[in-house]
Amino acid sequence: MKALIILGLLCLSVAVQGKVFERCELARTLKELGLDGYKGVSLANWLCLTKWESSYNTKATNYNPGSESTDYGIFQINSKWWCNDGKTPNAVDGCHVSCSELMENNIAKAVACAKHIVSEQGITAWVAWKSHCRDHDVSSYVEGCSL
């Protein structure tokens, strides 16, 4: 019985943690999903962005008390403008997606929403990109990844 409880807790912690991608694994996945060069944004810039937004974690969340919104998933997509979490006041849902879908281990829906955002607002929509990636050499993010 004790072993079952421990096993259950371990499974729960894995479900809450989600998938944390390895850098090169994420690079390959983003490339397969068409982000390399999308709207002129290099794969290295996408990796830099996701490193600083979520540390490559699909289940990352960040609550923003000022706007009463939450950022979700590997790209930290905001519930005020881009996804529906059912609790953010006056949400727009620009990507027409549930915020929980942006935290799935399969990041296809998150990538589709990121493409929509970068198409409308450019990569500067992400504060972490402006703070940590813009005007920096980001080539190290794809270095050694055999793409």
UniProtKB/Swiss-Prot annotation:
Outcome reported for the amino acid change (mutating S146T): In isozyme 2A, isozyme 3A and isozyme 4A/4B
GO biological process: defense response to Gram-negative bacterium; defense response to Gram-positive bacterium; digestion; killing of cells of another organism
Annotated effect of mutating G37D: In isozyme 4A/4B
Disulfide-bonded cysteines: C24-C145, C48-C133, C83-C99, C95-C113
Organism whose genome encodes this protein: Ovis aries
Note: Lysozyme C is capable of both hydrolysis and transglycosylation; it also shows a slight esterase activity. It acts rapidly on both peptide-substituted and unsubstituted peptidoglycan, and slowly on chitin oligosaccharides. The sequence of isozyme 1A/1B/1C is shown.
Residues of the C-type lysozyme domain: 19-147
CDD domains on file: LYZ_C (cd16897)
Main location: secreted
Tissue specificity remark: Expressed in stomach.
Designated name of the protein: Lysozyme C-1
Effect of N106D: In isozyme 2A, isozyme 3A and isozyme 4A/4B
EC number from the UniProt entry: 3.2.1.17
Family designation: Belongs to the glycosyl hydrolase 22 family.
Catalyses which reaction(s): Hydrolysis of (1->4)-beta-linkages between N-acetylmuramic acid and N-acetyl-D-glucosamine residues in a peptidoglycan and between N-acetyl-D-glucosamine residues in chitodextrins
Database matches in InterPro entries: Glyco_hydro_22, Glyco_hydro_22_CS, Glyco_hydro_22_lys, Lysozyme-like_dom_sf
Pfam families per record: Lys (PF00062)
Known partners and oligomeric status: Monomer.
Active site, per annotation: E53, D71
Keywords assigned: Antimicrobial, Bacteriolytic enzyme, Digestion, Disulfide bond, Glycosidase, Hydrolase, Secreted, Signal
Location in the cell: Secreted
Protein role: Lysozymes have primarily a bacteriolytic function; those in tissues and body fluids are associated with the monocyte-macrophage system and enhance the activity of immunoagents.
Molecular-function GO terms, alphabetical: lysozyme activity
Gene Ontology cellular-component terms listed: extracellular region
Signal sequence interval, chain numbering: 1-18
